[in-house]
Design a protein with these regions (language model features):
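Short, structured segments at the rim of ligand-binding sites
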Residues: 1-421
Length: 421
């Protein structure tokens, strides 16, 4: 279904359970490529378009999968393909996560430059630079990466930016590299620790230290293991904000509250009352938010993947809020769609200036990417009248059964197919 219609103005109320994290599931799925004649079992894998794309990619490389609910078991044969199909890689940026494990396992790989959400410039130069430091020979011709390395070797690598994808790719490559690899200025997101846990289960010595440095001692061959995908902190935070923007009372369950500290700190600053349990957060009705200033940055800072949803929520704050984006370029394109709904957002460079308004109005809008779509859903839930959101296919990449979850909270939501042009 490509279109979501929402009739807003109803305070949401109830409990929503959190899915497994998309951004954790994809790298740990890719890590199965390190195996040889063994299996990897993952629990709590979300049912998402991006997960399906990764499954298709792994299948094309020779991996078989058995699924029971949210449990997946990947069986990897002794021999796998080292050439990734272009039509799948172009669909999803996370396809680049096959690069490190394929190169380490097969000694060579051919991988088209990946696709996914169009959010400014998102190159994989840090991935390639790190692999070359480990001994890989890499060429890019006509948008395709050709990589070769008879034996990757452990090195001390400094990332110029704490890229999540580069950290994950280099961690997987280091698992089969000769000697110790030390990666400095790494990403510190919880999803990194989830991958580290999988690699430890495979018999690799991994020390993440929690300080932006990862040490990995490579092994000749990894073993099969079982691991659970962590809860999705971005999905959980989105539903927390759905409660806030509608003036409702929503409990988000099956979470790790510490992973949401940055959001909760800003909500407290904005005047939101909430209760934090051992594995849940409940937000209570607030008449109107106070304005806040936010800078989206790598973890443990405020997550860039939550920036659009927070901007949508702040459109109804009592005053002027400032939101700066420091991770991705051109991540405010959705603001034009929010302004169509009556928001007052001005973009100056990397900062959104949000003048709060009394109310939003339903309109026809377009989800240009995954998190932009989530932001429009939040705005629609609070708006007067009906909102039509087109190109919902982007949202299905990262949110499992969002229409059903919203309906369970009392939202007036309907899905339909887009009209053929």
């Amino acid at each position: 279904m490509d279109v979501m219609r929402i009739r807003g103005g109803t305070p949401l109320k109830g409990v929503v359970k959190t899915q497994g994290a998309k951004n954790a599931a994809l790298p740990v799925m890719a890590s199965c490529l390190l195996l040889k004649g063994r299996t990897l079992t993952l629990e709590n894998v979300p049912d998402l378009h991006d997960v399906s794309t990764m499954l298709d990619l792994l299948a094309c490389l020779g991996v078989t999968m058995e699924r029971l609910g949210n449990r997946m078991t990947f069986s990897v044969p002794e021999e796998i393909s080292w050439e990734a199909p272009e039509h799948l890689v172009r669909k999803m940026r996370a396809s680049s996560l096959a690069l490190g494990p394929l190169l380490a396992r097969c000694g060579k790989t051919v991988l088209p430059l990946p696709g996914g959400c169009s959010i400014g410039s998102r190159p994989i130069d840090l991935h390639l630079k790190g692999l070359m430091q480990m001994g890989a020979k890499i060429e890019i011709r006509n948008g395709i990466v050709y990589a070769q390395a008879d034996q990757l070797r452990g090195r001390r690598i400094y990332l110029d930016f704490p890229s999540v994808g580069a950290t994950e790719n280099l961690m997987m490559a280091a698992a089969l590299a000769k000697g110790e690899t030390i990666i400095e200025n790494t990403a510190r997101e919880p999803e990194i620790e989830n991958l580290a846990s999988v690699l430890r289960g495979m018999g690799v010595t991994v020390d993440t230290e929690g300080t932006g440095c990862v040490r990995i001692k490579g092994v000749e061959e990894v073993q099969g293991c079982r691991e659970r995908v962590i809860p999705d902190r971005i999905e959980a935070s989105t539903y927390v904000l759905a409660g806030v923007i509608t003036g409702g009372e929503v409990t988000v369950d099956d979470i790790v509250p510490a992973h949401m500290d940055a959001l909760l700190a800003k909500l407290e600053e904005a005047g939101v009352r909430f209760h934090v349990g051992s594995s849940s957060v409940t937000v209570f009705p607030v008449r109107r938010l106070m304005p806040v200033s936010i800078r989206a940055m790598p973890y443990p800072g405020f997550p860039t993947d939550l920036q659009p949803q927070m901007v949508a929520t702040l459109t109804l704050a009592n005053g002027v809020s400032l939101v700066e984006e420091s991770v991705f370029q051109a991540r405010f394109l959705y603001s034009e769609e929010l302004n169509r709904m009556g928001a007052n957002i001005t973009i100056k460079g990397d900062t959104a200036i949000i003048q709060g308004v009394e109310r939003l109005q339903g309109a026809s809008v377009r989800a240009m990417d995954l998190r932009a779509g989530a932001a429009l859903i939040l705005a629609a839930l609070a708006a007067e009248g009906e909102t039509r959101i087109d190109e919902m296919v982007h949202v299905w990449r990262g949110y499992e059964a969002s229409d059903k979850k919203l309906k369970a909270l009392g939202a007036d939501v309907a899905l339909e197919e887009a009209e053929e042009k």
